[in-house]
Amino acid sequence: MSKQVLKAELREQTGKGICRRLRAAGRVPAVVYGKGIAPVSISLGQKELSEAIAGEGGRNHILTLECAGELNGASVIVADLLRDSLKNVPRHVDLHKINLADKVKVHVKLNLVGTPAGVKAGGFLDFAMHEVEVECLPVHIPAHINVDVAELLIGHSVHVGQIVAPIGTAILSDPKASVVSILGRKGAAEEEAAPAA
């Protein structure tokens, strides 16, 4: 996963009023959490944060903070992100301070590869699980995990346990959970049950 530098400013004051003023100035209130540290309140540039978590991999990009104090040079990943429902811009973000030598747990998007044989035969694709929980070192966080569905027939499914985990990663999600299924054509059951004319 790529690393990006993000400038941050420490903030001593908290509260709704302060957060509103920060947002009006184009900044996003944030809190940094981590093992062995007390939560630290900071603010980030809205544009810079949006660009840092845009594209493939999104929230799983490793961010390096550039700021005053002990957090300068700290590596973080997004733990929780609140967006404005109308403008779709970040309103608040929780960051998790990580050690690049320690494994982390993150959610990674699944990418379906190929057109299922069952869809070509008239079936419908039911994509039930769009991401899985993965454990790995930060540098091994994948942008996505491919799931080959080209050979999937009507009535067949792919479960989490069938997904090939990228090198250096372990998938933690329930192996029995259904990821994608191919359902029969609408009305197919009725056609099969109907007597021949």
From Swiss-Prot:
Instruction: Identify the InterPro entries for this entry.
Output: Rbsml_bL25/Gln-tRNA_synth_N (IPR020056), Ribosomal_bL25/Gln-tRNA_synth (IPR011035), Ribosomal_bL25_b-dom (IPR020057), Ribosomal_bL25_C (IPR037121), Ribosomal_bL25_long (IPR001021), Ribosomal_L25_dom (IPR029751), Ribosomal_uL5_bac-type (IPR020930)
Q: How does it assemble?
A: Part of the 50S ribosomal subunit; part of the 5S rRNA/L5/L18/L25 subcomplex. Contacts the 5S rRNA. Binds to the 5S rRNA independently of L5 and L18.
Kindly list the GO CC terms recorded for this protein.
Answer: cytosolic large ribosomal subunit
Q: What's this protein's family per the entry?
A: Belongs to the bacterial ribosomal protein bL25 family. CTC subfamily.
Protein species of origin: Citrifermentans bemidjiense (strain ATCC BAA-1014 / DSM 16622 / JCM 12645 / Bem)
Q: Which HAMAP family match?
A: Ribosomal_bL25_CTC (MF_01334)
Q: What is the protein named?
A: Large ribosomal subunit protein bL25
Q: What does this protein do?
A: This is one of the proteins that binds to the 5S RNA in the ribosome where it forms part of the central protuberance.
**SUPFAM superfamilies given for it?**
Ribosomal protein L25-like (SSF50715)
What CDD domains would the database entry show?
Answer: Ribosomal_L25_TL5_CTC
Q: Which UniProt keywords apply?
A: Ribonucleoprotein, Ribosomal protein, RNA-binding, rRNA-binding
Question: What Pfam family is a match for this entry?
Answer: Ribosomal_L25p
